From Swiss-Prot:
It is a single-pass membrane protein. Residues 1-30 form a transit peptide. This is Altered inheritance of mitochondria protein 39, mitochondrial. The gene is AIM39. The keyword Transit peptide applies. Keywords: Membrane, Mitochondrion, Transit peptide, Transmembrane, Transmembrane helix. Signal peptide: none annotated.
Length: 340
């Protein structure tokens, strides 16, 4: 830009100097650069500094070589960060575009199939859903849990010595369950995501599918909801063993001869649904936790599983002694750890 403008400016000077010799004298008086010193100073014969039309120049500040090197390094780093940001933004946009294009445009809109878009890992522990809570008799679970807990207490020597037999509270009443909570634990890890299906998809023969899931509709396109897809590691492992010609039963006989094939799967009673909470099994365990007050300074807490019957996992006595809360483990089930 500077050289181009300089060339035009020089040609104009030559024309004017030829047409009017007085212009040469006038230009010299106005300290104009002659034709032999375009890039040098005629007084010192040194190279002129480049023009700084768009730069802020402070002649009072003299930058050292280290400052210049640091400024160049910072400029290179800033440029590298910008390139990385652009690269990752483009890569993320591409991944999202391909995922949405395949899951929604191809599978849902074109193939008219249900699709699942994974987002984040799902929680392993969660509350009972409204549908699952109807299938579990919580009052019966509470009563059975209390009976199993009282059986452990009455057979424990320390409880007999401190509270006597039959077991009663400090007010002379029969111990009762003060607090009782129930929750679920997924057997397999899962992924939380978005379930998308065609807008004209219907399941008239499956009333539970409509009753337990709340779908959101985008008019003219599709329906979507949040769902969880289990990652069945055990099934994949069994499929791999069958592929190489090894039977799961033979493997269990080698690892633990006392364990029956498939006994673990009968521990959970819940959940029959599709692959995203709806035709395959999503294995769950029901856990419960209860509290029983024995006195103002003593409380029993118990925890266990429930399937057809109650199975206690641990019973503890929490007691206040010398202004300190002490925990006594009265019962702990070690069978699952030995068999696992």
């Amino acid at each position: 830009m500077y050289l181009a403008r300089s060339g035009v400016f020089i040609s104009r000077i030559r024309v004017l100097s030829i047409l009017n010799p007085r212009f040469v004298l006038l230009s010299r008086r106005l300290n104009h650069t002659d034709s032999k010193h375009y890039f040098t100073d005629p007084k010192t014969n040194e190279i002129k500094k480049p023009p700084t039309f768009f730069q802020h120049h402070d002649s009072k500040v003299n930058a050292s070589a280290d400052d210049v090197a640091q400024a160049i390094a910072e400029s290179v780093r800033a440029h590298k960060k910008r390139r990385q940001k652009v690269f990752f933004s483009a890569m993320l946009t591409g991944i999202i575009g391909v995922t949405l294009g395949f899951s929604i445009s191809y599978k849902v809109l074109y193939k008219k199939q249900e699709s699942f878009i994974p987002l984040v890992p799902s929680r392993k522990w969660h509350r009972l859903s409204a549908y699952d809570a109807q299938r579990v008799n919580i009052d019966e679970m509470k009563m059975l849990g209390k009976m199993r807990c009282l059986s452990v207490l009455t057979n424990h020597e320390m409880i007999r010595e401190q509270f006597g037999i039959p077991l009663k509270t400090d007010t002379g009443e029969v111990p009762s369950v003060k607090s009782f909570e129930v929750w679920c634990e997924d057997q397999d890890p899962g992924v939380l995501g978005i379930v998308v299906r065609p807008i004209d998809a219907t399941r008239d023969n499956d009333s539970r599918y409509h009753r337990t899931h709340g779908w959101h509709t985008i008019p003219g396109l599709f329906q979507w909801r949040m769902g969880t897809k289990p990652i069945k590691i055990r099934d994949k492992f069994d499929s791999f063993l069958k592929f190489i010609g090894v039977n799961t039963g033979d493997l269990l006989e080698v690892i633990n001869p006392d364990r029956e094939v498939g006994d673990f799967k009968y521990e959970y009673p819940l959940r029959k649904g599709d692959s995203f909470d709806g035709d395959d099994d999503r294995a769950m365990h029901i856990w419960f936790f209860g509290e029983i007050d024995l006195s103002q300074d003593a409380m029993v807490v118990f925890k266990g599983k429930y399937h057809v019957n109650v199975k206690l996992e641990q019973v503890d006595l929490l007691k206040k002694e010398n202004d300190q809360l002490i925990r006594y483990v009265l019962y702990k089930n070690e069978n699952d750890k030995k068999n696992g």
